[in-house]
Amino acid sequence: MVFGAMKGGEFIVEPLTLPAHSDTLDLCLDTMVTGFRTIIEKLGEKPVAISFAFPGPADYPNGIIGGYLPNFPSFRDGVALGPFLSRTFSVPVFINNDGDLFAYGEALGGILPETNAKLEAAGSSKRYHNLIGYTFGTGFGVGIVVNGQLNRGDNSCVETFCLPHKDNRDMIVEDGIAIKAIKRIYGELSGDSDHKFEPKDIFDIAEGRIPGDAEAAKKTFAEIGAAAGDAMATAATLTDGLIVIGGGVTASHKYFMPALLAALRGKIHTFKGEETGRIQSKVYNLDEPEEFEAFAKGDQQKLKVYGYDEEVIYDPQKRIGIAISKLGASKAISVGAYTFALGQLDRM
């Protein structure tokens, strides 16, 4: 567990890392209290709130953690974590899913405002207000922000990890994307199922930095990219906004992004055989300068107002963009937690 403090959107003390002790509830909660108390003592003043990410399932609005938590088994029967910390430190406590906070941080202080600023600088009238954030790591996390508001759902259960995998409709897509999938797929493609490589090692193999099956490594990342893109296409169809990807696996984006983009740009057919896009908007890779230039340009044109000597700007091209996080997942989650707390305090 990592503890820190922010002011003005920036860290103001050195982060503190402590073991989670997740299998023993008393020790885990004691460690949390120690971590927060240590940070507060460094501040010299009382914080206005505590806000952080915690894995679900959970009733996040009420601060209750409970259910099937593989990494926090001692919480499975239900723990009123928010109320406990609020009473311990006498401040409001806000808990959210890490995928939600990643997306919120990117929407308010990352890729969304950055993209809109670049569009303005390019002379484009197009602006974006909606965003999907995905994290690639131990899981396939997601968060959705609509018009500046975090979509927490009615059950704190906005997820896409459980969408079906494109090649095995009975398997969740997360099992074809997460770290464990990268290791498994590389083992299958290389014929070395007993390997001990981590995703970073498999990336280094693809790059030719260490011995291994480079072709299998490259194909591994292509496979996870195709699976992720297929799932993202479903979500993007419903949210119609920008997509940002974060997490440790994004270092290998040169190998997974082509297949991911191919899936997003894929075609689907009607019963009569007519072809249409899997996503109705054109998808641009915002990290490629030439694609961003075309993205900013769109199909902007002047349209005469009927019956008046006046023109308006019209851009009929429907388009969305995807990019790798510049903030990084950890910073984006922290920014999301910080901004979420301030927003909630304003409403109190």
Regions found by a protein language model. Give the residues of each.
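Glycine-rich phosphate-binding loop and adjoining helix at the ATP-binding site
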Residues: 21-33, 46-49, 58-128, 254-271
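Short glycine-aspartate micro-motif
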Residues: 47-51, 131-135, 244
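Adenine-nucleotide phosphate-binding core of ATP-dependent small-molecule kinases
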Residues: 16-48, 183-254, 280-281, 325-326, ...
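Glycine-rich phosphate-binding loop plus the immediately following alpha-helix
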Residues: 95-99, 111, 151-201, 342-347
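Short beta-strand scaffold segments in enzyme catalytic cores
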Residues: 1-6, 133-135, 140-145
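Solvent-exposed alpha-helices and their adjacent loops that cap or buttress functional pockets
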Residues: 120-128, 133-136, 314-315
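Glycine-rich phosphate-binding/hydrolytic loop that grips phosphoryl groups
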Residues: 96-109, 255, 262-348
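Short glycine-rich, Thr/Ser-proximal phosphate-binding strand/loop in the N-terminal lobe
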Residues: 1-34, 38-41, 45, 65-68, ...
